[in-house]
Design a protein with these regions (language model features):
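Zn-dependent metallo-beta-lactamase
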Residues: 1-51, 57-59, 222, 247, ...
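Active-site metal-binding loops of divalent metal-dependent hydrolases
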Residues: 14-15, 55-58, 94, 115-116, ...
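Short glycine-enriched, charge-decorated loop/helix-capping segments at active-site entrances
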Residues: 26-30, 60-62, 66, 126-129, ...
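Metallo-beta-lactamase
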Residues: 70, 75-81, 85, 115-168, ...
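Cap/insert and terminal regions of metallo-dependent hydrolase folds
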Residues: 74, 178, 184-279
Length: 279
């Protein structure tokens, strides 16, 4: 019997921006409270293989109210991985905060959904509401990668490597994909923008930048099917991720978290909330 390999998963924060609750939900939110957004890339690795999920935004894009704390390549260096070593990059979608520094990975192939390439080169880009989060230079650069035989396309779901698979979700964009990774604690799903925050999939609420609202809602159910539990679903932009999961090291607390390890905060909450036995 073939045993699937286990991987470590590192969530690397490279940027952030302030925000308010009403801007993160369709229909707004009655509580006008602070709700900042973090920006991550994710490194999946074991002794045999290293795969990067997304490449973040560029310094040019940071001027749009965002803060660039470090480039994704600099973030990876903090955990001992050089950008030049990476051979496979999964692009969950082509928004500018997920594909921006692709050029820092000169030896990589890029794994992308057919529908995302169809979306960014087709009629929907005639509408500013869909076009706005994309950068034409990044889209055309990915087309060039196709002509260089450096793009691997998927139609729905597919295996990138044993224990690592991509799954078309849609909703946020036509071709959004999430990533399923086998770890020592089970199947972890990197939702990316299928769920920006925990609150989106936990309460079936939608982020307002959306291609298809129905697909986004159905996507929450897909995430649950793919993951071993809701505690195995990792949202794409929630600052709580770095609080709920153990840091890669004491020095990297608040910068890099280990998603292949059990969520510390949830464990603590569960212990604290246990009923006190009667005496």
């Amino acid at each position: 019997m073939n045993t699937l390999p286990n991987y470590e998963i590192y969530c690397v924060k490279y940027g952030e921006r302030p925000g308010r609750r009403p801007e993160h939900f369709v229909g707004g939110d009655p509580h006008d409270e602070s709700m900042p957004m973090d920006y991550f890339v994710w490194l999946v690795r074991n002794a045999e293989r290293t795969v990067l999920v997304d490449t973040g935004y560029t310094a040019k894009m940071a001027i749009r109210g965002r803060v660039l704390l470090r480039t994704p390549a600099e973030g990876l260096a903090l955990i001992g991985t050089r950008a030049s070593e990476i051979r496979d990059v999964i692009i969950t979608h082509l928004h500018n905060d997920h594909v921006g520094t692709f050029y820092d990975f000169p030896n990589a192939r890029f794994h992308l959904q057919d529908k995302e390439m169809e979306y960014v080169t087709g009629r929907h880009m005639l509408h500013n509401i869909f076009r706005r989060p994309y950068e034409i230079d990044e889209v055309t650069a990915m087309i060039r990668k196709v002509y260089e035989n450096r793009v691997v396309f998927y139609n729905g779901e597919g295996e990138v490597a044993p224990g690592i698979s991509v799954h078309h979700i849609g909703g946020h964009t036509m071709g959004l994909q999430s990533v399923r990774v086998h770890t020592a604690r089970g199947w972890v799903v990197l939702a990316s923008d299928a769920s920006h925050y925990y609150e989106h999939f936990e309460k079936n609420r939608c982020f307002p930048l959306v291609y298809h609202l129905g697909d986004m809602l159905e996507g929450f159910a897909a995430l649950r099917r793919l993951a071993d539990s809701e505690q195995h679903i990792v949202p794409g932009h929630d600052p709580l991720v770095l609080q709920r999961y153990p840091a890669a090291s004491a020095e990297l607390r608040g910068i890099v978290a280990r998603l292949d390890l059990p969520p510390v905060a949830l464990f603590i909450e569960a212990v604290v909330c246990q009923p006190v036995p009667a005496r």
